[in-house]
Amino acid sequence: MQFDIITLFPDFFTSPLQSGLLAKALERDIARVNLVNLRDFAHDKHRRVDDEPYGGGVGMLLKPEPIFEAIESLEILPPREIVLMTPQGEPLHQALLKTWAGSYQQLILICGHYEGVDERVCEHLVTREVSLGDFVLTCGEIPALAIINGVTRLLPGTVGKAESLKLESFEAGLLDYPQYTRPPVFRGWQVPPVLRSGNHQDIADWRYQQQLDRTKERRPDIWQKWLEEQD
């Protein structure tokens, strides 16, 4: 998987890409990350990539020329997706991460800034707009990093035990069940006895019921969708 990141702040990614599973995946060439400094495609001495919006308004917009030129400079590795990080995009979800990991060779991630980007970028270049949720961040680098992390961990060879990916939240349409480790009693709080019983069927039944209860309580939207899929 090739990730090309169009950003004003390449250094933002330095530490996360050198840590944990992401670093190992890059070392093994499971994934590749190419950081593209948008200012390298500015054409004035100040390396300016933003300007005032037509019609007035607060703040600045990223200009179309540097973004188009930055992406046109990249090697094309189809199938690819050109993604803009924006609060106006569709919410990022696990199914989308799985689609990217399983069906795409290249993700080009445009990190938004200021008040956004010239709409012509969205209309004629971007293939998908994505948001982390109903809130606003100072930059698009944070959601871009979330996508890199979320997709890479789904690529074969990244996670040691592939089976663990099948048992986590959202894979069965439900949230994950609660988990415990040693000690069996901590400050008077006890691990549920069923988990120490050794009865695998009882444990499986308990975990499934916990998934149902937790999803219904915490994420009624997911719960309703799950119910509809059972019909």
From Swiss-Prot:
Listed InterPro entries: Alpha/beta_knot_MTases, tRNA_m1G_MeTrfase_C_sf, tRNA_m1G_MeTrfase_TrmD, tRNA_m1G_MTases_N, tRNA_MeTrfase_TRMD/TRM10
Q: GO BP, one example?
A: tRNA N1-guanine methylation
Signal peptide (UniProt feature, chain positions): none
Gene of origin? trmD
Q: Which GO terms describe its molecular function?
A: tRNA (guanine(37)-N1)-methyltransferase activity
Which GO cellular component does the record give, naming just one?
A: cytosol
Binding partners and assembly: Homodimer.
Which keywords, in A-to-Z order, does the entry hold?
Cytoplasm, Methyltransferase, S-adenosyl-L-methionine, Transferase, tRNA processing
Binding residues for S-adenosyl-L-methionine = G112, L132, G133, D134, F135, V136, L137
Q: What does this protein do?
A: Specifically methylates guanosine-37 in various tRNAs.
The UniProt entry's sequence similarity note says: Belongs to the RNA methyltransferase TrmD family.
Q: Which NCBIfam families match?
A: PRK00026.1, trmD
Q: Where in the cell is it found?
A: Cytoplasm
Top-tier EC class? transferase
Matching HAMAP family? TrmD
**Name of the protein this chain belongs to:** tRNA (guanine-N(1)-)-methyltransferase
